[in-house]
Amino acid sequence: MYEEAHIDKHCHNNDLAMTFQAVVRFNQVIATCMEYAFYHPNTFVLITADHETGGLTAKEGTFVYTSKNHTSADVPVFAYGVGAELFNDITVENIQIPQTIASFMGKDDFGDQSTYQSLVK
């Protein structure tokens, strides 16, 4: 698991240059994960965000932030590997993502405290 929290931080500040640098770092991590998954076919890669921040839009060839806060915009979910087909062409709620990952580990009662304890051991 990897989180590039600086994307969110810099979007709150409407700082496009720093956001871009954070996205480049995130893309490098994604490339490493995808290469690993390519050579290890039982690997599942999931790329998403827990929310959108800043309302970044492109207007007349210029990128413009519309907010310094989280928005209600949907965020994409990209999946690769075993089980990726579960995320093809659908809209999911955030809670469905960890539930699906837990089910890959044989845990059907995600959210139950005992399940959480067994996953973090």
PLM regions and their residue ranges:
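Feature captures the catalytic ectodomains and active-site-proximal regions of enzymes
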Residues: 1-121
